[in-house]
């Protein structure tokens, strides 16, 4: 994901730099979402792109921020969804069906691993109920093809390349969340928003699949003024077409979804813009 975030940041700079009078943009490559929160806390960065769940953990002092909350990175906009997708052998239709199965839950300590256990836990499954193995999603796909595991989790924008490739030569089965599973997940983890993958997102997918997603989220330091952030957010939405030409992910940018996913404090500059256009 760091590759996509860096590319998205680069397009923001290219398109918006000339439009901004109150700030200039510089893009830095970093060590992913947790590092990005730390950089804002330390004053090394003023804005960052990161996963919406990570900003939640930072504000709550959970997971990677256990007992040490960091609250000065504020919500600006959810840019696009990163969907929690569960690729499984045929016959596994709900999360509950994963009981007793061997599942690749992502790399150790990854965001995917955290999201996988959130989804499994909300369905009532503990670490004793499944045989969890760690590895990248590509590892999981390969092991699924070889019959070594029963399912694999990934958290990525759909359509995801590894699933597209898998679907060309294998029977595609993506696990769809039941209404009860979805309700339990959203009650426990409000930052996991509903995301339905429309039929035809992948070859061989003939029905909609109900998933949850986190968002690739733009945050800003609370030390940035309201005026600076307001100007930035307005310029971003005003120049959506040019941004989308630069990177397809900006096609998903929408004021409703950009503001709706906010489960932490919103930056006053962003809030001013959303209220002005009537989505808040």
Protein language model regions, located:
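Short beta-strand-centered segments that line the small-molecule binding cleft or hinge
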Residues: 57-61, 71-78
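Extracytoplasmic
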Residues: 22, 32-35, 42-45, 70-71, ...
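Pocket-flanking alpha-helical
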Residues: 10-14, 26-67, 93, 138-143, ...
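Segments of small-molecule ligand-sensing domains
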Residues: 209-280
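Pocket-lining segment of extracytoplasmic ligand-binding domains
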Residues: 52-54, 62-64, 127-219, 224
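Bilobed "Venus flytrap"/periplasmic-binding protein-like clamshell domains
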Residues: 1-19, 23-27, 81-146, 260, ...
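Sec-exported extracytoplasmic/periplasmic mature domains
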Residues: 13-21, 41-45, 60, 91, ...
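Structural recognition of the beta-strand scaffold that forms the well-ordered cores
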Residues: 26, 46-51, 75, 85-87, ...
């Amino acid at each position: 994901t760091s590759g996509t975030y860096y590319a998205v940041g680069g397009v923001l700079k290219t398109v918006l730099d000339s439009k901004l009078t109150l700030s200039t943009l510089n893009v830095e490559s970093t060590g992913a979402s947790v590092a990005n929160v730390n950089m804002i806390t330390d004053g090394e960065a003023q804005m960052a792109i990161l996963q919406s769940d990570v900003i939640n953990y930072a504000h709550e002092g959970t997971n990677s921020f256990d007992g040490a909350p960091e609250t000065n990175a504020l919500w600006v906009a959810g840019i696009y969804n990163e969907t929690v997708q569960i690729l499984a052998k045929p016959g596994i239709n709900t999360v509950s069906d994963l009981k007793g199965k061997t599942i690749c839950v992502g790399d150790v300590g990854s965001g995917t691993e955290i999201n996988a256990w959130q989804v499994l836990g909300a369905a009532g499954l503990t670490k004793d109920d499944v045989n969890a193995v760690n590895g990248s999603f590509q590892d999981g796909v390969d092991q699924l093809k070889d019959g070594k595991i029963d399912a694999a989790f990934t958290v990525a924008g759909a359509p995801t390349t590894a699933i597209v490739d898998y679907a060309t030569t294998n029977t595609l089965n993506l696990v769809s969340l039941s209404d009860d599973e979805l309700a339990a997940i959203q009650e426990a983890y409000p930052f996991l928003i509903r995301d339905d993958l429309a039929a035809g997102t992948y070859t061989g997918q003939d029905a909609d699949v109900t998933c949850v997603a986190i968002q690739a989220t733009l945050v800003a330091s609370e030390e940035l003024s309201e005026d600076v952030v307001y100007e930035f957010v307005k310029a971003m939405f005003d120049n959506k077409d040019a941004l989308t030409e630069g990177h397809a992910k900006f096609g998903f940018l929408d004021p409703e979804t950009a503001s709706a996913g906010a489960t932490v404090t919103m930056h006053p500059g962003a809030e001013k813009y959303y209220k002005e256009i009537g989505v808040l």
